[in-house]
Amino acid sequence: ERFLNEKQTDLRWDKVILSGSSHGSTTSARFAKHQKVARVVAFAGPRDQLESWQSLPSATPANRYFGFTHVLDKGWTADHYCRSWQMLGLAKFGPLLNVEKVKFPFGNSRRLITDFDVDGNANKAHGIVVRDGRWKDVWKYLYTHPVDKMGKPVPTDPDCTMKIRPN
């Protein structure tokens, strides 16, 4: 009942957290552009590298989007995720932080990465951030950190290729 409005005819979207991994994170982030939600947690994504919807106006404020991925994930090495995170405006809420080097509360940033050893396996890297219990503190942060506590704005990442579409 806590997720239904008083008449029980619709969801109380302000209580809903959308989350997904890979393409599921893309779907979550894209949905939140149209419907204001409590927050969006994107694991290994969003991955819509050739589109520009990420920079469109959003029903969900940008400080409510959180991302976490592995640096060997092909979506990261090909600049898909960093591009999406920049287009979503996440640099306004703190720097890119490696959770292996910076601990909770991760500078109140919305952009978290890990370089945990996956034996150089990009496929393993893609799903590891949702499978390995070693990141319980990260998950708790992503799902419960107060959205009004934000890191300081930083410039966009000059190493992130923003134009991925071929000419």
Residue ranges: model-predicted function:
Residues 5-11, 33, 54-59, 147-151:
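Surface-exposed acidic, glycine-flexible loop patches that form ligand/cofactor-binding
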Residues 3, 31-34, 87:
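Structured segments of extracytoplasmic/periplasmic soluble domains
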Residues 112-167:
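Catalytic active-site module of serine/aspartate enzymes centered on a nucleophile-bearing elbow/loop
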Residues 26-27, 83, 137:
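Extracytoplasmic/secreted proteins, especially bacterial periplasmic and envelope-associated proteins
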Residues 38-130:
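The feature captures the conserved acid-bearing segment of alpha/beta-hydrolase catalytic domains
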Residues 15-20, 43:
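Short beta-strand immediately N-terminal to the catalytic nucleophile in serine-hydrolase-like folds
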Residues 2-17, 155, 160-163:
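Gly/Ser-rich "nucleophile elbow"/oxyanion-hole loop immediately N-terminal to the catalytic nucleophile
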Residues 18-28, 32:
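Gly/Ala-rich beta-loop-alpha elbow adjacent to hydrolase catalytic centers
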